[in-house]
Structures are given as structure tokens and as C-alpha cells.
Amino acid sequence: MKFGSIVLIAAAAGSAVAAPAKRASVFQWFGSNESGAEFGQNTIPGSYGKEFIFPDPSTISTLIGKGMNIFRVQFLMERLVPSSMTGSYNEEYLANLTSVVDAVTKAGSYAILDPHNFGRYNGQIISSTDDFKTFWQNLAGKFKSNNLVIFDTNNEYHDMDQALVLNLNQAAINGIRAAGATSQYIFVEGNSWSGAWTWVDVNDNLKALTDPQDKIVYEMHQYLDSDGSGTSESCVSTTIGKERVTAATKWLKDNGKVGIIGEFAGGVNDQCRTAISGMLEYLAQNTDVWKGALWWAAGPWWGNYMFNMEPPSGAAYVGMLDILEPYLG
């Protein structure tokens, strides 16, 4: 799916890691997306504090205090590497991104680096696996000493050749490992917006992905409105959550894979509360393959957005956190 007022100064990534927080939750991971640095996608590069913002470490700390232990941090490739995927960094943007990652991992939680690009760079489908490998080799090299960083290959590939989606994911894996980042998990995403409900029909070929470190996690997204887009506060039924992840659960089991729901949400209403609770209960019954889930989304600039998980007054933080609490650490 689809913000701090001062520029954050980054610490070195290697110095910003603590031991993973101990979990009382049934899941290995449970947390939230942290949105803002990908805002203003129609204004590139845009200005910090005007078109985009970075997540606020203080509100992330509040969510950690509630028991969350994983945060998916959105950013745009075009802002990080403005000239080309293989080019030099915008050092200020990298510093801000690194600061957020450091704040998360110093607290013992996991930070997912999420290039929120939909398989595209400057509006064009990424077609060069070599360039994509280099992008990831360069970025992973910045965080290779921080084992609480997770690399998400790209957000929600869509309307792309299926073999290309496979090859881009494999190129990212190869680049990350070539950088010497060998301890971190890699989250791979699929075509058709990485939807769990379409995964079996669309993304079966991704079972061929390989990783010498055997730390691939299949990241799927699932919304509960009629078209699965997450653009409505309504949910189709009280049982739609479980129904939309059942086939993907079987696929994970049949293929010896593990997965995570990288985005989910529903409106603050009784039907969605029941549907989300049912989905999470089902995932919790299948933790051999489901390692957790992340709400969409927190972030400083969401305002009155229907799924806003930003403390202290976001609609979902106020109206949905209680149904997530059984799964928090």
C-alpha cells in the first residue's frame, strides 16, 4: 500500500544493535509498518518535512512498550539513490533512514528495510537484475553488522512478468549475501501486490528461490475489503480474514516455507474487528509456517487515516490495539 521536525543524525549501523527482545507472544514477530519516508511519490526528490518525513523514534518506543518487536520502515529508492539504482547515496536521506533503523534495533526490535517501489524505479518496471543485485549489495553492506535488520526485496510487485519477479527476488538475495550480510532474514514479496489470497495462483514459482543461509521469509499482504486493496474501512464478512489466508497457509506447508503477513488492516468497526481477530487466531494456530504479522500503518503524518496506528491518537491505535494485544510480547 500505499511523518519529527528535525533532521536525524545517524549513528553507525554496526553500533546500533541489541539482543533481540524476549517474546511472550506465540509469534516470532508482531509489529507495525512505519510510514512517511515514501510519501510524496509524485514529487521526487521532494523536501524533508514537506513532501516526506521519517518515523518518530519516540512513538516507535511507545509501540515497543506495548509489545511490538518488528517495524517495517518504508523508503523510496529514488530518494536514496537519485541518479540510478547503482549510483551514489543521498547521504542525508540515508542518515535519516539509518537513524530510524538504529532506534529500533537498539531497543532489541527488528527493523525491516522496505523499498516501497512496487517493482519500479522512476516509474519504470525494474528489468535489470544486475542493477537490482547491485542496489541490494550496496545497501546490505551498510547494515551487514546489524543482525536485527531485515531486508524486504521490494514492496508489492504488480503487473509484471512472473519470471521477472522471481529473478528480481533471487538477484536481491544474491546481492545481500554477496555484501557479507549473512545473519539477516530476507523477506521476499510476490506479484499481484503480494496478496495472500492470490498467492497460490500467481506466485507459485517463487518456491524456487534459494538462499545459502536459509533465511527466506515469504511476505504476503492481506486486506479484507471487497477487492483486497485496503482502501475501504469495510470488511467483507466476519470470517474473511481466515478465508483469505487459508490457501497460502497450505502452500507454505506443502513447500516447506515460512511466511509473514507484512501488511494487514481493517476499519474500526465490529465486523472488521471480528474478521481480523479470526485471521490472527488462525495464523497463531499455524505458527509452524506463519512467523508473525505487521499492521498497516503507523507514521507521523497519517492524521485521520482510518488505519492509523500512530500513538497516541491514531484511529487504529485507539480502536484496534486491544484485539492485537493477545499477540504482542
From Swiss-Prot:
Entry keyword set: Carbohydrate metabolism, Cellulose degradation, Glycoprotein, Glycosidase, Hydrolase, Polysaccharide degradation, Secreted, Signal
Record carries keyword Glycoprotein: yes
Gene Ontology CC terms, in alphabetical order: extracellular region
Annotated glycosylation sites: 33, 96
Gene3D superfamilies given in the database record: Glycosidases
Signal peptide region: 1-18
Family note: Belongs to the glycosyl hydrolase 5 (cellulase A) family.
GO biological process: cellulose catabolic process
Organism: Neosartorya fischeri (strain ATCC 1020 / DSM 3700 / CBS 544.65 / FGSC A1164 / JCM 1740 / NRRL 181 / WB 181) (Aspergillus fischerianus)
Protein name: Probable endo-beta-1,4-glucanase B
Cell compartment(s), UniProt: Secreted
Active site (UniProt): 156 (proton donor), 263 (nucleophile)
